[in-house]
């Protein structure tokens, strides 16, 4: 049994993430960028104008759908999470400052991957028995590639449903509970017995909240995400900017460190001199992937519910999503850490302590501890919301609506388990299945890349183009 577990958490995890996901992400990003004429660069202004530029306009959705904004905030709910804070901190600690450069580079390329996922999701979506729009990799396989490719969609759903319990549930709940404990300990340290009881109470409360929202369907999830995601993101951005400009003299040198060590990490000297170029590249690329989820196909499930007639129009939200998640929030986390001048033990894994120490340079230790704890808590909560939808849709595709209701009940129960149990092995296995999701998704993306290119050409480049 131990050998099987080691295979899933070690060998298979390495193969899935390092030897399949990362190469496919870079090659796929380059390929789709070329096929679609680099619209993430040439049409970036148009994309921002027609996504973030419309956020404050009143939008209403038709039956069985959500507004385009609710769709993207639901996707961002699952995407903007602990990876933006802890993941970016780890990229710097394990890959050096130069890892931030590779994080940026990957984000620019994977914008076209997420654009393609969302575009295909709208193009090949369908109505379910309730009349709701459903889509995602399993549907663009089914309706775009045909019955002989059904196994690809089934594989995706199996991998995603399993991953939803770990990456999208237990690990996030554990992060919330840990954050709440940190916030409480900043004022009144709790005894071990009291902590266990508190964790159980927290777990039940979180499960109840998730249940109320989840059983309200996609419209309720979208309504909550639409309000929560912008608020938590803006607050985090504001406090990060306060720290960065509070150390304004370090902004230039911070960028200097990032670019100077992107190709020669040993240039920093000292503890960072032990970091190899491979580590810098791999950790930058890997944390970028963990942060924005481009290539996993998960966000396409949320976007499929958007009330829109244009696949490309919704696809532009995919570009915005990566920009907001990685280029904006991850960059601010990185600059907050580097500009603050906090000590970094290179080559060692870190949690939230780096960003907490950075905030403490401006706001003091107690406030920083509470703020980071609350930020992690909100980010983790919205991640659970997004993944509850993803897992539910995958189970629905495999077994039907009735069984998806059973999945939802099980998902809520697992929330409580994640709050009180230490299940590192389960999380590691789920992380492997998270990476495996990319394999069937990339098969479909490459096979249907011509469809995306055709839709993009019709929208942007034909004489009677749809883009105004």
Give the positions of each predicted feature.
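Transmembrane helix-loop junctions in multi-pass membrane proteins
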Residues: 4-5, 35-40, 83-88, 166-176, ...
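Helix-loop-helix module between adjacent transmembrane segments
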Residues: 32-33, 106-131, 138, 142-174, ...
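Membrane-interface loop-to-helix entry segments
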Residues: 24-31, 35, 39-48, 173-180, ...
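N-terminal alpha-helical transmembrane segments of multi-pass membrane transport
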Residues: 1-82, 92-99, 110, 416, ...
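Alpha-helical membrane segments and immediately flanking helix-loop junctions
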Residues: 59-94, 120-138, 142-144, 155-161, ...
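Transmembrane alpha-helical segments of multi-pass small-molecule transport proteins
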Residues: 22-27, 153-158, 184-218, 234-236, ...
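Flexible loop linkers connecting adjacent transmembrane helices
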Residues: 38-66, 90-100, 112-146, 343-363, ...
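Extracellular/periplasmic helix-exit of transmembrane alpha-helices
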Residues: 115-125, 129, 239-257, 265-272, ...
């Amino acid at each position: 049994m131990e050998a099987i577990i080691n295979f899933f958490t070690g060998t298979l995890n390495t193969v899935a993430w390092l030897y399949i996901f990362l190469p496919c992400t870079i090659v796929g990003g380059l390929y789709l960028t070329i096929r679609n004429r680099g619209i993430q660069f040439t049409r970036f202004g148009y994309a921002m104008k027609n996504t973030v530029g419309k956020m404050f306009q009143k939008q209403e959705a038709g039956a069985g759908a959500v507004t385009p904004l609710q769709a993207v905030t639901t996707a961002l709910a699952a995407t903007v999470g602990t990876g933006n804070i802890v993941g970016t901190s780890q990229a710097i600690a394990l890959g050096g400052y130069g890892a931030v450069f590779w994080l940026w580079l990957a984000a620019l390329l994977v914008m076209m991957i997420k654009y393609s996922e969302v575009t295909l999701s709208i193009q090949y979506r369908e109505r379910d028995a309730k009349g709701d729009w459903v889509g995602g990799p399993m549907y663009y396989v089914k309706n775009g590639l045909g019955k002989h490719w059904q196994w690809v969609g089934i594989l995706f759903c199996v991998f995603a449903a399993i991953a939803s319990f770990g990456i999208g549930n237990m690990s996030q709940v554990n992060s919330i509970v840990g954050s709440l404990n940190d916030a409480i300990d900043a004022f009144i340290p709790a005894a071990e017995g009291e902590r266990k009881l508190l964790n159980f109470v927290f777990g039940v409360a979180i499960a109840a909240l998730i249940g109320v929202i989840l059983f309200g369907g996609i419209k309720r999830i979208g309504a909550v995400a639409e309000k929560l995601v912008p608020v938590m993101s803006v607050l985090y951005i504001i406090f990060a900017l306060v720290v960065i400009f509070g150390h304004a003299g370090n902004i230039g040198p911070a960028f200097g460190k990032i670019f100077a060590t992107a190709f020669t990490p040993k240039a920093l000297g000292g503890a960072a001199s032990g970091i190899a170029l491979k580590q810098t590249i791999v950790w930058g690329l890997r944390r970028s992937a963990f942060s924005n989820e481009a290539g996993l196909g998960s966000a396409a499930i949320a976007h499929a519910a958007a009330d829109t007639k244009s696949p490309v129009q919704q696809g532009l939200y995919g570009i915005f999503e990566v920009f907001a998640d990685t280029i904006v929030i991850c960059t601010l986390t990185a600059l907050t850490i580097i500009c603050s001048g906090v000590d970094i033990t290179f080559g060692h894994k870190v949690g939230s302590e780096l960003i907490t120490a950075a905030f403490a340079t401006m706001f003091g230790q107690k406030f920083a501890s509470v703020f980071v704890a609350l930020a992690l808590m909100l980010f983790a909560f919205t991640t659970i919301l997004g993944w509850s939808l993803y897992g539910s849709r995958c189970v629905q595709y495999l077994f039907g609506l009735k069984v998806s209701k059973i999945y939802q009940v099980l998902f809520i129960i697992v929330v409580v388990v994640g709050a009180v149990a230490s299940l590192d092995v389960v999380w590691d296995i789920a992380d492997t299945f998270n990476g495996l999701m990319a394999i069937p998704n990339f098969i479909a993306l490459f096979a249907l890349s011509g469809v995306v290119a055709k839709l993009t050409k019709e929208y942007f480049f034909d004489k009677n183009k749809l883009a105004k």
